[in-house]
Amino acid sequence: SSDLCNLTLYGFPVIMPLYLATTNNGGGAWFKVSQWSQIWGFQFVVTIFGNVFWGRMGDSHGWMRQMRWFGCWFCVIGTLGMYYIPQFFGANMVLMCADAVVLGLGISAFVPMGAVFPALASEHKGAAISAHNLASGLTTFFGPLIATVLISTIGFGGVCWTYAICYAIGSLVTLGIHPHQPGFDDRGHRITAIERN
């Protein structure tokens, strides 16, 4: 599930201007490219505040639980929303911006990933951080690659569903990842004061 958030973060700038602002490959030309840029920029504003919010939430409620339920599933909803909102509601900037909030919160909910890798390999933290950087780079590459390879065969909707399925699979994968997080047991449950004593 490493850095799955990068799939849409780097894949959507490839396909969404075509989908939302042209009629190519089944696009609907609902918005101008400048409007898409505003939607996408708004999503990045949300991630700035989301990074701070989720950093605190992850420390309080568990890194993996946060990424599993909020990171992966908000990204599923936000990804599919970017495709289906124009299909059903046309050029509705309010709904698209609301979806950008969901997607931005989902992407930023992966913020504990930088702590998870070193926690999984506490004896090899340098190598763990290198592996994290490699995973980030690969998903930065695979997001646009998925879009480029699949768009001509399964269209914009198919690409969005592919991303969404990857997020759903990532959610399942997190069930088998158990980093040591201070204040939590190996299953990701908070250790109470009574249990510590």
Regions found by a protein language model. Give the residues of each.
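Extracytoplasmic gate region of multi-pass secondary transporters
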Residues: S2-W40
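Cytoplasmic membrane-interface "Motif A"-like loop-to-helix N-cap segments
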Residues: S60-W73
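Hydrophobic core of transmembrane alpha-helices in multi-pass small-molecule transporters
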Residues: N92-S108
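A membrane-interface helix-boundary motif in multi-pass transporters
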Residues: A147-Y167
